[in-house]
């Protein structure tokens, strides 16, 4: 989990638009963020394995 202060800081409107960055909506992680799903790779994997993300399945071949 990211610090609460960092999560609040990311939500505030920035003075300059280039400073804005994405954070995971679940845990607040800033790295390995997937825009399409709005979450980081770790939360994405957990939710996909539980079947909480429609249309996403684990691949096997």
Curated annotation (Swiss-Prot):
Domain of life (superkingdom): Bacteria
SUPFAM superfamilies: Glucocorticoid receptor-like (DNA-binding domain)
GO cellular component: cytoplasm; small ribosomal subunit
Cofactor-binding details, from the entry: Binds 1 zinc ion per subunit.
Cofactor (UniProt): Zn(2+)
Entry GO MF terms: rRNA binding; structural constituent of ribosome; zinc ion binding
Protein name: Small ribosomal subunit protein uS14
Species the sequence originates in: Roseiflexus castenholzii (strain DSM 13941 / HLO8)
Gene behind the chain: rpsZ
